Amino acid sequence: MTLESIMACCLSEEAKEARRINDEIERQLRRDKRDARRELKLLLLGTGESGKSTFIKQMRIIHGSGYSDEDKRGFTKLVYQNIFTAMQAMIRAMDTLKIPYKYEHNKAHAQLVREVDVEKVSAFENPYVDAIKSLWNDPGIQECYDRRREYQLSDSTKYYLNDLDRVADPAYLPTQQDVLRVRVPTTGIIEYPFDLQSVIFRMVDVGGQRSERRKWIHCFENVTSIMFLVALSEYDQVLVESDNENRMEESKALFRTIITYPWFQNSSVILFLNKKDLLEEKIMYSHLVDYFPEYDGPQRDAQAAREFILKMFVDLNPDSDKIIYSHFTCATDTENIRFVFAAVKDTILQLNLKEYNLV
């Protein structure tokens, strides 16, 4: 065998090895691409206090590790702070709305609670417990609570204030429902990934207040689905940032902007009409037609009201080929969210079967 033929033979062995390595790299790249495609990015959008953070907490309960006692203990201080924040908001509103206290001694209680620096609150003890209990039982404060649409008050106010004995117990440990109800405005971006049927769902919650929205822009790449939350109960409320703008009009304007963004041409849109429980309560005394004169349905009818609100949002969609999937929800109700998200998951997977190699 000549030297040339020996070298050619060696070279072809090297070439074969190089090709084998190259093929393996190509295969790995294809695998990586396929695996990357098995991650679905769900962007949670909506105005402030529409229920986005509560929805993420539910995903942790339903599809994640939930909340251990240690995790729940971490919310104790926030529950106390929510109680003080709510009572201070009502005390301020008593002045603004010129509502008198029925019981004279509650003026001193109000002064005591008013002077608390909420951010420094880490305990819930007397004299504050008795002061807040006494205030909550004052008919003046109850009238003020009934007029809450005229100022900003957390949806969880009644939930906590009706349960002060339990929360004031020295051995208090927040329940799962306490955790779901606690209000902490989202600043920045919160991501929650969870695994379902060998697909990673990456849920991204961005702050809803106006100042937070400019931070959204870089979340817009490769979004599988937009999940847009609307608080049904906000039809008669004004914005935190601007007290002459209707919250639902703001939500409609944001939805219109989002669904016409070029980034989202290929993203499915799922509309969650949230806080259906609060709508059912409120519609009995606050009439939709007073805020949306075009409503011509019956008064005190939650079903008619929510269908009207759904139509208002769906009509904002300029693309007749784009389907808007919608669900009525109560984000603090784990079973409701479990049921709704199972349907949403199936919709998303169906829409992405080929794209994500799920068939």
Curated annotation (Swiss-Prot):
The modification Deamidated glutamine is found at Q209. A lipid is attached at C9, C10 (S-palmitoyl cysteine). Changing R183Q: In SWS; found as somatic mosaic mutation in CMC; also found in melanocytomas sample; somatic mutation; shows significant activation of EPHB2 compared to control. It catalyses: GTP + H2O = GDP + phosphate + H(+). GO terms for molecular function: enzyme regulator activity; G protein activity; G protein-coupled receptor binding; G-protein beta/gamma-subunit complex binding; GTP binding; GTPase activator activity; GTPase activity; metal ion binding. Predominantly expressed in ovary, prostate, testis and colon. Down-regulated in the peripheral blood lymphocytes (PBLs) of rheumatoid arthritis patients (at protein level). GTP binds at S50, G51, K52, S53, T54, S156, L180, R181, R183, N274, K275, D277, A331. Pfam families: G-alpha (PF00503). Residues 41-54 are annotated as: G1 motif. Keywords: ADP-ribosylation, Cell membrane, Disease variant, Golgi apparatus, GTP-binding, Hydrolase, Lipoprotein, Magnesium, Membrane, Metal-binding, Nucleotide-binding, Nucleus, Palmitate, Transducer. The keyword Metal-binding applies. The keyword Hydrolase applies. Its EC number is 3.6.5.-. PANTHER family: GTP-BINDING PROTEIN ALPHA SUBUNIT (PTHR10218), GUANINE NUCLEOTIDE-BINDING PROTEIN G(Q) SUBUNIT ALPHA (PTHR10218:SF329). Belongs to the G-alpha family. G(q) subfamily. This is Guanine nucleotide-binding protein G(q) subunit alpha. It comes from Homo sapiens (Human).
